[in-house]
Structure formats: C-alpha cells, structure tokens
Amino acid sequence: MRRPICGAIALLLSACTVSSAPPSVTLTVVVSPSASAIVAATPTPSPSPGATPRPDPPVAAADADALAVQMVSAERAVRDQSVTGADLAWFGHLQQLTYRRLAATPELRDTVLAEMPSDLKTAATANADATADLRATVVPGPDLPSAWRIVEPAPLEDLARYYREAEAEFGVPWSYLAAIHLVETRMGRIRGTSTAGAQGPMQFIPATWARYGDGDINSDRDSIRAAARYLRANGAPANMANALFRYNQSQRYVRAVTAYAEVMRADPDAYRGYYQWQVYYLTTRGDILLPVGYGR
C-alpha cells in the first residue's frame, strides 16, 4: 500500500525532511536526559488545599525506581473506571512518557520492568518494546513539521464504536484498527499530508484510497473502515502479520502495532490509556510536545 516508514508513522517520534516553521502555540521539551523526576504514586483526582500541584504536562522520572512507580501508577489509573476526565488524560499522558523515557534511556529498561507486578508485566513489556521499535525507525532532526496541524481527537466512545463496527463488517480485530490509528496519527490528532503523500487519520496514499476507501479520507470512521477493508484484502484476520506488513513495510512497524493491539485484546481498558497519548516529535533538542493548536 504504502510509503517508507519515515513518512508514515505520523511520526509520533521524529521527522524525515521537514522545514522549520514558527508554531502558533508554546512548545515544551518534555523528555530529555536532564529532566527532573516527578513521581505520581496514586491517582489523586482533587489535590487538597496547599498540596503541590502535579506538573502539566507530566514529567517522567529519570531514575529507574521512581520511573517504575510512575509506570505502575499510570497503568493502574488508566484501567480504573473511576478515573475519568482530566485525571484519566493526565495519567494516560504520564503512561506514554514513562515508555518514552525507557526508549530514550534503554539502560533503565531491565530494572524498571523487573519491578512491574505480575498482572502488568506483559503489557508493560509490550509497550516498552513497541515504543523502542518505533523510536528506532527515525532519526532526530533540528526542525519541526511545517505541514501539520494538531487537533482534538474524536471522542473516545465514538472511535471505539468505529473500530467495533469495522470489525463486525470486515472481521479485522478492533484492537488492531485502534493500534494502527494510534501509531499513524495518535488517533486522529495529526492532520496533514506525510512526506510520502499519505493522508487522513489512517494515512492512505490517494491511489490506495481510490481502491479501498469509501467516503472522506479525512473522516475517522471512513478511514477506519477503509483500513479494515485493506487489511482483510491482505490476509487479515488469519494472517495479521502479512496484512500489517502490506500496510507499512517495516517489521518494526508490524511488531509495534501488534504489541499495542494484543495489549488491548487482552485488556480492552488499555484503550483508555492509549487514547490519551499525545503528539511528540523527536528532535536534536529532545522530545517536543506538539499540543492541540499547533500549526494553526
């Protein structure tokens, strides 16, 4: 179907060749080797008067023990149905940053994962592996993407319904559609054409869309259906690895999407966390958060 991986992953991580452009919002370097440690031990929806406010955005800890505490806290919170709204968003963001920290400082990996409780170890290992795989596909550059806009995603419940509807229609597991959506555009947050010409929330080349698409390439629902149709035509659900490789010809991409998908298949509540993940751009200055409003 597709383009080289550098132009496809909406880059969640980095750039291929982009020109610098002054953003219209304030940008923050969030993950860097010198970042200070902030530990969130338990979900705390409403801090008491006089309590130290939690950082926004969250900050991943720099040492292994504190990072493990953050990771467990975030993984527990996103699976807790009583954690909603701004608290869910914050803990989902923290979850993302803990894995980005591991990918950026792999020497912490074994110590951190060894501290995961047994019920979280499989998911934590999968998330760590997927983040490392995606990070390995890109090379940091000095500039930010000039052709991107960052927007609010469609509501969590709406996207979940689109994935389930596409699964019912084409037989492709909903979790794989959600994982592709996550990797390609952070579930629709990134708007803009990739360096290889891919468009829309599921990043279709126009020629492929002409064959498999129906409706609006920029519609979450329509592009999710098209992705399911394309995957089905290439072996899904019986041979998901082949279907994913045809979607994007990188074994790292296949492994990463599969890892996220299988975490959600094993525990659908994991989707609540992934939905909160934000758009980061890996540069020579570090990880840059591109917030909603960037590029407008």
Residue ranges with predicted function:
Residues P106-T111, G171-A179, G192, A236-Y247, ...:
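Surface-exposed patches in mature extracellular/periplasmic domains of secreted proteins
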Residues T185:
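Conserved alpha-helical segments that form or flank metal/cofactor-binding pockets of metalloenzymes
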Residues W90, L94, A179-L182, A226, ...:
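Amphipathic alpha-helical interaction segments
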Residues E169-P173, G197, L290-P291:
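Extracellular/periplasmic catalytic domains that process cell-envelope and extracellular macromolecules
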Residues I150, A154-E169, S175, G188, ...:
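Alpha-helical segment that forms one wall of the substrate-binding/catalytic cleft
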Residues M1-E165, Q251, A259-R296:
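Cell-wall glycan-active module
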Residues T195-P201:
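Extracytoplasmic ligand-binding site segments that recognize negatively charged/polar headgroups
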